Amino acid sequence: VSNLFITEPQLEVAETLDRLIGKGNSQSGKILFQNSGAEANEAAMKLARKYQGLGKHGVVSAYKSFHGRTLATLAATGQPEKHEPFAPLPEGFRHAEWNNLDSFEEAIDQTTGAILVEPIQGEGGVNDAGSDFLQGLRKLCDEKGLLLILDEIQTGLGRTGEWFGFHHAGIKPDIVTVAKGIANGV
């Protein structure tokens, strides 16, 4: 079944996800089901571009990050060695030093529309973002009018001791992407 049709089980899962993201309170958010983490991150970046409008298409993500293997998610991935075989990649992606708010602020320019980070980098070496960093990114996004996208592909659905990794920081991202844990290996 595609996203063109709504089924009862799909609706129940969407309502549950909305409630879990809000730590027990419905966020009245929108849930879009995709086939993979890469598709979820791709959709998140497309949504950010659509929301921000023409000229605010840029995304800042962290070095050592991993966001997928589509061209856009690969461009967001902060591992240059993964870029080389597929160059040229889409434009508008910049990278900043992990856990360094100053580096993220320096990477933002007039074309930036969103920041995309993982609460814990998996492929980059199991690097925890820490509450102060995530809270700082939330504040930075609010000040600059940017969307904060949290890639919870590895960390979502209880894998950090909270339903989502960002819950540890007490922040509310604009977009959350989930995969892996939601399918339970299916």
Give the location of each predicted region.
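Short, conserved catalytic or adaptor-binding loops enriched in Gly and charged residues
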Residues: 22-23, 83-90, 167-170
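PLP-dependent aminotransferase-class I/II
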Residues: 64-121, 125-131, 143
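Acidic, glycine-rich active-site loops and adjacent beta-strand->loop/helix elements
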Residues: 8, 37-38, 63-67, 154-157, ...
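Catalytic PLP-binding core of fold-type I/II PLP enzymes
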Residues: 109, 127-161
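Active-site PLP attachment segment
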Residues: 162, 168-186
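Glycine-rich loop-to-alpha-helix module at the N-terminal edge of alpha/beta enzyme cores
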Residues: 1-54
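Short acidic, glycine/serine/threonine-rich loops at helix termini
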Residues: 43-46, 70-75, 126-127, 158-163
